[in-house]
Regions:
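Sec-dependent bacterial lipoprotein signal peptides
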Residues: 1-24
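Surface-exposed short loop/turn segments
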Residues: 66-72, 76-120, 125-142, 146, ...
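Short, solvent-exposed mixed-charge patches
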Residues: 166-168
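Sec-exported extracytoplasmic/periplasmic mature domains
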Residues: 60, 64, 152, 156-164
Length: 168
């Protein structure tokens, strides 16, 4: 009896929560096509280096760039990386690192070139450094990829919130 009652109660609560949320003015960030289309119309210009390439790739995925639409905005950015030794062995060799990636970005109007929005996204990740050279390089590159993904996600959320505010 209890096993069949729990799913029914959960389904009822879920069904009742929709009207309650909409009556308080809640709308999902991506509930409007304005945000999705606005993000898809942003052209990302890659920064220099491997980190710049990784951030651009992640931003292209996150913004879902529509190549069939002329861009309304261009996103330009710079990437700064700092690496700190966090775990040190007895022989004074680092075996754990912290990677701090800062992405300073500017959103420009595609027609006028005027800056319409700017911001900064910071991502901090850690990774182990193995004794084997290949494993150490692979770990560092994985850390870069994770930091680029996190920074791109923060930029995407900032842009989506800005677009949603403009649509309201």
């Amino acid at each position: 009896m209890k096993r069949t009652l729990l799913p029914i109660l959960a389904a009822s609560a879920l069904a009742l929560s929709g009207p309650l949320l909409s009556s308080c003015g809640f709308t999902p960030l991506y509930g409007s096509q304005t945000v999705t289309k606005g993000l898809g119309a942003i052209e990302v210009v890659a920064a220099d280096g491997r980190a710049g390439y990784l951030v651009r790739e992640q931003l292209d995925d996150a913004l879902a760039r529509d190549v069939n639409v002329l861009p309304s905005h261009r996103l330009v950015f710079t990437v700064k990386e700092m690496r700190y030794a966090r775990g040190v062995r007895v022989d004074n060799v680092a075996n754990r690192y912290e990677l701090n990636m800062t992405v300073n970005w500017r959103l420009l109007d595609a027609k006028t070139g005027q800056q319409v929005r700017a911001g900064s996204a910071n991502a901090v990740v850690t990774y182990d450094s193995a004794d084997q050279p290949y494993a150490a390089i692979a770990a560092q590159q994985d850390g870069q990829e994770r930091a680029a993904t996190e920074a791109a996600r923060k930029i995407q959320l900032d842009l989506a919130a800005w677009l949603a505010g403009r649509a309201a």
